[in-house]
Amino acid sequence: MITIKIGGSVVDDLHPSTIADIKKIAESEGVILVHGGGKEVTKVCEQLGKEPKFVTSPSGIKSRYTDKETAEIFTMVMSGRINKTIVQMLQKNGINAIGLSGVDAKVIEADRKKKLLIVNEKGRKQAIDGGYTGKIREVNASFIKSLLDQGLTPVISPIAISEESEFLNVDGDRAAAYVAGKVGSDKVLFITNVDGLLMDDKVVPKLTLAEAKEIRPKIGPGMEKKILASTEALDMGVTTALIANGQKENPISSAISHDNCTVIEHE
């Protein structure tokens, strides 16, 4: 079984062979898709006159600050347009996909963060209200497995539900890692717009789990989250994490074959 995270930046730019590639893999093993879409959320926020706000953690991770209004827009865009567009593409190509958010059947439960520690404009650490951002606590693995058993391909948007039944924004890469770990996927694949982790403009072909943890603080914000998610997935029992480019031919099967991508394994 493989869990695939499709980054929002590549949803509209996937290689034409990608859907057929997903279909081929889905026929031989279960496929779970988790998607992003942050850029589309930002675009809709601006169209609605809501200025997007981003914050940076002391470790350098940049993330969206999600107040109540942003959480509503995030839910609308992620679980509406983006999720259903992906499901439509899959259905059009003979893949029996079902679109879900983490709210449906409590697929992803999270705890609302009370405080966020950020670095402010003056470069100082500051604690601010956590807004509607969540830390993933649980995944409804049995429900996801039941969909796979019926021959369905789940397509999950990273909106979680809190104990108080609030919509919470959770990071898509980490959502994919938790889904992969809890469901028991042997592989998690992060599809992005570069060939993997780049160091000195060259793809790093292989990392052990220990090496990935050691190297993570030295990596730029976008890829840093993917390395973090990869290590979390492996810590939860996933065998292999892959980071690959979705804009080349047959990106899924190429990554599974370890062709021109970054592979992270326990040893």
UniProtKB/Swiss-Prot annotation:
PANTHER family: N-ACETYLGLUTAMATE SYNTHASE, N-ACETYLGLUTAMATE SYNTHASE, MITOCHONDRIAL. Involved in both the arginine and lysine biosynthetic pathways. Phosphorylates the LysW-bound precursors glutamate (for arginine biosynthesis), respectively alpha-aminoadipate (for lysine biosynthesis). InterPro entries: AceGlu_kinase-like_sf (IPR036393), AcgluKinase_fam (IPR004662), Asp/Glu/Uridylate_kinase (IPR001048), LysZ (IPR037529). This is Putative [LysW]-aminoadipate/[LysW]-glutamate kinase. Its EC number is 2.7.2.17, 2.7.2.19. The lineage of its organism: Archaea, Nitrososphaerota, Nitrososphaeria, Nitrosopumilales, Nitrosopumilaceae. Coiled coil: none annotated. Substrate binds at residues 37-38, 64, 169. Pathway: Amino-acid biosynthesis; L-lysine biosynthesis via AAA pathway; L-lysine from L-alpha-aminoadipate (Thermus route): step 2/5; Amino-acid biosynthesis; L-arginine biosynthesis. The record marks 5, 226 as: Transition state stabilizer. Keywords: Amino-acid biosynthesis, Arginine biosynthesis, ATP-binding, Cytoplasm, Kinase, Lysine biosynthesis, Nucleotide-binding, Transferase. NCBIfam families: argB, PRK14058.1-1, PRK14058.1-4. Disulfide bonds: none annotated. It is found in: Cytoplasm. The keyword 4Fe-4S does not apply. It is an enzyme of class 2 (transferase). It catalyses: [amino-group carrier protein]-C-terminal-N-(1,4-dicarboxybutan-1-yl)-L-glutamine + ATP = [amino-group carrier protein]-C-terminal-N-(1-carboxy-5-phosphooxy-5-oxopentan-1-yl)-L-glutamine + ADP; [amino-group carrier protein]-C-terminal-gamma-(L-glutamyl)-L-glutamate + ATP = [amino-group carrier protein]-C-terminal-gamma-(5-phospho-L-glutamyl)-L-glutamate + ADP. The gene is lysZ. Belongs to the acetylglutamate kinase family. LysZ subfamily.
